[in-house]
Amino acid sequence: MAKKLEITLTRSVIGRPEDQRITVKTLGLRKMHQTVVHNDNPAIRGMINKVAHLVKVKEIEE
């Protein structure tokens, strides 16, 4: 089974650089405490690393 990542926006993007805002938007997060599920792949991992201080990540098995 493929791993999935549950990503939750825990901190606001207000006052953050534009590249971080775009990364959060690309992950599909718009509101605080919103959670999205993505497949675990290098592209998603790279985006998470870029905004790791703004999100909480949990691995789930499906």
UniProtKB/Swiss-Prot annotation:
InterPro entries hit by this protein: Ribo_uL30_ferredoxin-like_sf, Ribosomal_uL30_bac-type, Ribosomal_uL30_CS, Ribosomal_uL30_ferredoxin-like
GO BP terms, alphabetized: translation
Gene Ontology MF terms: structural constituent of ribosome
Xref: SUPFAM superfamilies: Ribosomal protein L30p/L7e
Keyword entries, A-Z: Ribonucleoprotein, Ribosomal protein
Gene Ontology CC: one annotated term: cytosolic large ribosomal subunit
NCBIfam families: rpmD_bact
Family: Belongs to the universal ribosomal protein uL30 family.
HAMAP family found in the cross-reference section: Ribosomal_uL30_B
Subunit structure: Part of the 50S ribosomal subunit.
The protein, known as: Large ribosomal subunit protein uL30
Source organism of the structure: Geobacillus sp. (strain WCH70)
Encoding gene, per UniProt annotation: rpmD
